[in-house]
């Protein structure tokens, strides 16, 4: 059985499209993809290597829901790391990291780097949980500090090849965000 990458997507259609695009990157790298939302009734899953939570921050309720899902994934996927991205990750990095040691954060401004994570996982198959989260976070921090990389990624990097998990496709025209969160 191949390792599973699980996605939870909150918020707008853009997040849904970008989660599909990131899922395509992982699928093309040989990982199995799960996009069915977890609930309290979901059984523990030891095959999940990484959970990706694409967040929203339009309301305080959206942030609360993101924190609840992050905690749920930490409990239901004990071997996995949890990668949090999106608007909430952009605005509240330290708050999210304080939830647990198996968490890494990729701000929404750098979300295009999700496409780099499959290669990180392939090159480091021995890493799980806390060690994997720390390694991914360190990789992101290197990207943030590299001249020329500390910029918004090409806006269409996470456009999916196909829409395997939705019945309708979306056409991305723009992000609609100038990435100057305060």
Language-model-detected regions and their locations in the chain:
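Proteins enriched for Cys/Gly/acidic motifs involved in redox and nucleic-acid/cofactor modification
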Residues: 1-182
């Amino acid at each position: 059985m191949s390792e599973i990458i699980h996605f939870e997507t909150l918020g707008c259609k853009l997040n849904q499209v970008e989660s599909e695009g990131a899922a395509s990157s992982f699928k093309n790298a040989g990982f199995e993809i799960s996009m069915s939302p977890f609930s309290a009734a979901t059984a523990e899953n030891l095959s999940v290597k990484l959970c990706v939570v694409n967040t929203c921050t339009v309301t305080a309720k959206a942030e609360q829901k993101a924190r609840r899902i992050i905690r749920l994934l930490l409990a239901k996927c004990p071997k996995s790391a949890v990668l949090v991205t999106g608007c909430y990750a952009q605005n509240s990095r330290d708050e999210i990291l304080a939830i647990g040691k198996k968490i890494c954060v990729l701000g929404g401004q750098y979300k295009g780097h999700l496409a780099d994570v499959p290669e990180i996982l392939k090159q480091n198959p021995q890493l799980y949980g806390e060690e994997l989260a720390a390694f991914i976070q360190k990789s992101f921090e290197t990207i943030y500090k590299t001249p020329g990389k500390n910029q918004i990624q090409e806006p269409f990097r996470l456009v999916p090849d196909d829409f395997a998990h939705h019945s309708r496709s979306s056409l991305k025209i723009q992000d609609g965000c100038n990435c100057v969160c305060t």
